[in-house]
Amino acid sequence: MVRGYEMEMDILRDRMVRAERTCGEEAELIARLRTDLSLSRSHEQQLEKTLGEVTGSKFWKMTWPMRYVVSKSRQLWHTLPLFVFLRELRSGGIEGVREQARARREYAALFPGKVMRADRFAPVELLVRQVDDQPAGPKISIVVPLYNTPLDFLEELLDSVVNQTYRNWELCCVDAGTAPGVGEMVQQRAAVDPRIRYRKLEKNELIPGNTNKGIEMATGDFIALLDHDDILHPCALWYAAKAIAEQGADFVYTDEATFEGKVENVVLYHFKPDFMLDNLRSNNYICHLTLFSRRLMDAAGGPERMEYNGSQDYELFLRLTETARKIVHIPHALYYWRSSPGSTASDISAKTYCIDAGIAALKAHYARCGVAVDDVSLIPGTPGYYKTDYTIDHPGRVSILIPTCDHIRDLETCVESIYAHTTYPDFEIILIENNSKAPETFRTYKRMQKEHPDNLKVVTWEGKGFNYSALNNFGEKFATGEYLLLLNNDTEVITAAWLEEMVMYAQQKRVGCVGAKLLYPDDTIQHAGVGFG
């Protein structure tokens, strides 16, 4: 027992020795630190004295302008890339450089997108200027139905919306997918920007149903439809809002670009015409980006319809354009459509149900408009393009006017092809003789009139030279038909229903003139339409 106490005493004495040694070392460390602190304070005082002598010297005061220029140049250098710095310096001098730097600083504060940067699409100056010059437009609700959206695609989409130069918008995201991270990413953005809204759907109701859920969320006066993997140009909503505010548009659409991989890799630009009903009846050329007023949507029968899944946008656009007061086309590519395997941007034939739905949408459109049609079909080899056979309910006589001067073999080919291929029952041919010299020409005229006494006649123009307008105006005086067809004598009819195809358009009150596609002998196109304006 005594031995145990002695051992404990030895342990305690050993601990006391170590503690005393540690205390001594710490005391030495404190003494060294106090010495270093004293030296540092002395050095600081010396530096302050030296600095005072420098800043108070005449040299320092005389070189202040040079130091100011160097300082500002460093700021500009860090703000602008080298090539921009040199370009602005050469074109606008130091003032141009400063203006460019100011715009870029403002841009950095206004456009937070890190992945899909706004300045990848437009000059910084334009972006900043549009933010400062807000159109008096409506609140625009951008509806995006999400479905297992790849997160990198979603991040680009969100950046492209947040970076809009027009600020009066909201983003309505409805999510019917199961992929992890999608909802979290949108909700994280929504926590920073309350204009972004998210709703998790209980079930997938396909694109039409999911889109309609997003429209239900929307509080804006205008709706814009955005696919979940596509990208908006930063100026898209600004141009649309300007058209709405200044032109009273209730339906707006823009040009677009299709890209693969990175947005810079554009594989197709889709430059569209202004609104053309016949174009829309052939193909949904409107597509993206489209905005329409809520009032117009309600007047046209509501949002998208499930029975047209696959061509739900096409069916909606047909209804909206039937009712719209003012349709405006913005001729700028403001929408970037991502092409991926299986997407309609890549090939609509990948989704045959889209084609069937498109045909059904067209038939419903004609029924609403009171337009009689015999058939609507897909044009072979052109997925997404439809052909309408209108019912010919006003089949008047067609007077075919053919100015001719010798070249009798060409004329024979032309006339014989008309009689060989034409299935339209009521037509006449008027050959307008224009100073022919060859006797064979006149013998051929007599033979043709003898072979076709009921619907072929030859009239002789007394004028000189070749004046196509004057010749046809002269021939028209002898025409008995309701429709006039101007035909060159070196053409050949190759399609049986050629007159039916033109008459079914010409009979419509909104149509004044109809043209047919012309081919060269090697089947290349000679003429396929004329644009005005």
Predicted region positions:
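Short, acidic, metal-binding catalytic loop of nucleotide-sugar glycosyltransferases
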Residues: 158-168, 416-426
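Conserved nucleotide-sugar donor-binding catalytic segment
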Residues: 276-363
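Cell-envelope/extracellular polymer assembly enzymes that use nucleotide-activated donors
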Residues: 138-143, 170, 315, 396-401, ...
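Conserved donor NDP-sugar-binding/catalytic core segment of glycosyltransferases
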Residues: 231, 235-266, 491-533
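A conserved acidic beta->alpha catalytic loop
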Residues: 167, 175-184, 203, 227, ...
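Short aromatic/hydrophobic "clamp" motif used to bind/position activated sugar donors
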Residues: 223, 484
